[in-house]
């Protein structure tokens, strides 16, 4: 999309003294459809509306020094009073604010219904995503249970569902696998030690001095990463550095999730085929995994393959029906739970594990394991991994909470959301859990089934508690291929983003490129590197946009004080001898040369004019030998007898957000070059920040502050008045464009 179609309107305050009511209530412009510039010129004898200078008095800045500022801040934040203590407690525990006001009659039915449905959906997904995180199934149930309870206490969003999220599970799984390899564990060390660990004992590996087996060490790594990620999130909330999420644009997050979805799909392929393959990590793991899959395709377990196909044939159409008829269905069909129950019964009574060597979930213990402190020795190894995990987690949580709050007309506190998601990771990390965040799919289900408040999270937790205390062992015979299918089917939303690309391309090609770069790097390199590449590329695109910004000459809309781009609109009026130039970007060291070249190209190049004058003077010298004083006299005569048509350049600064020292120096240089050939430079519509920069940078002297105007129209009127006062003859028809 060209910037001309989005040019800003520069509307100056009309002269109230004139009482002019002749302006039309609406301004109609016709977009320029042709390559040639079509505009009208004022006649030379036209009179500009009477010129009156706009004067605005600036607010006086307080002279508070740094010491006084610090003292005031400390007094404000460090005072202890009953009222302040109460506000702090209520702010940290939002449940104490809204729960006493809970409307039981109005909200209870919707909250219970949505909580039940989300809980039913979470049971199979929690078990399935545990495999993605490299953990035993019970740990996924723990994670969803504790996250639901803690967010109920600390969260400010009424609608988001906090629990396991596929992309974070993938990132946890990659870290866990790497640490398992570093510790010397391999696929052979997968003894079912959950029952032993749950009884408080440890298992000694016969080949080493390890204090626990592979699954025990895996959750140790996962809980340590989760603890550090939670600490990062709480620290970001405490220091109010949520601005980090600003660098994660919607295009970047969408591309990252889509790229990670390919990695998730790839990691689940071995379960669908029943292959016993090592999990690959690092750069290019997606390609390496598929190479391993095709090399071992002849070892496919037909029982697992048939089960996977049958589950896909049931899950995909039903999920599509749920989505297509969600407005007519009171609640989505819990097809995942139906498939899990049916597959578990078929596997148990058909003895698929014993007869066909089908891989199953295995023993899932009931109850809760004793809390355990994260492994401090692992912190140096996983601290860097936790940075990306924490940023993705809070960015998705905050963006979803703000989106649904806006939709339903209430507000959320971004910092409190960071506290909430941080403690949803810190506290559960002591109870054998891994990282959580909000998830869009479950949040949409929660909203569509009548959720009103955070109380629905308690109902979800009760459903999970029932499974943990009673039902969990019944999933012993559940095939892992079924869990893999559930994981893959839930990737539909992320993979459908490809359908949005044509629309995204028509809106912003730059965002589309960011999406592709982030998606490809996340899929082909790794999730962490993909996120880093996406952030760096987004920042590069921002710099690129300001390095080569759009600029244009402006014309006056007839019978108004509105100025628009002559290259975008037709029938705009151009005042002879005055060029109005708009630069759509901050003016700083990166784009200063672009500013000068665009200005010189679209108006007149003062350097070329001075060179032409010098050449003309030299020709005069060759024709007639004169003294040095004579040369100066001849040049002065030459200049006075060949006046330029262009006498004023007005720079519209409305789109210039800020200036740096290089930008101020560039404006000084431009002004000096133009004044050398008799053209005055005026600045219009400078915001207060730009005005302060110009004043501090000594762009003009105190008596020259009249060269800064509050509107483009005011600057144009001033230029005409000053030209008429000087009595300069302005010839018509002379073009000075340097094109």
Swiss-Prot record:
Classification via InterPro entries: S04_transporter_CS, SLC26A/SulP_dom, SLC26A/SulP_fam, STAS_dom, STAS_dom_sf
Q: Where is this region: Disordered?
A: 1-27
Q: How is its activity regulated?
A: An extracellular acidic pH inhibits chloride-sulfate and chloride-oxalate exchange activity whereas an intracellular acidic pH activates chloride-sulfate exchange with no effect on chloride-oxalate exchange activity.
Post-translation: what modifications?
Answer: N-glycosylated.
Annotated keywords: Cell membrane, Disease variant, Dwarfism, Glycoprotein, Membrane, Phosphoprotein, Transmembrane, Transmembrane helix, Transport
What SUPFAM superfamilies does the annotation carry?
Answer: SpoIIaa-like
One GO CC term of this entry?
extracellular exosome
Q: Where in the cell is it found?
A: Cell membrane; Apical cell membrane
Tissue specificity, in the record's words, reads: Ubiquitously expressed.
> What sequence ranges are listed for the domain STAS?
568-719
Involvement in disorder:
Diastrophic dysplasia: An autosomal recessive disease characterized by osteochondrodysplasia with clinical features including dwarfism, spinal deformation, and specific joint abnormalities.
What is the protein's known function? Sulfate transporter which mediates sulfate uptake into chondrocytes in order to maintain adequate sulfation of proteoglycans which is needed for cartilage development. Mediates electroneutral anion exchange of sulfate ions for oxalate ions and of sulfate and oxalate ions for chloride ions. Mediates exchange of sulfate and oxalate ions for hydroxyl ions and of chloride ions for bromide, iodide and nitrate ions.
Q: Which NCBIfam families match?
A: sulP
Report what the protein is called.
Answer: Sulfate transporter
Q: Which organism is it from?
A: Homo sapiens (Human)
Name of the coding gene: SLC26A2
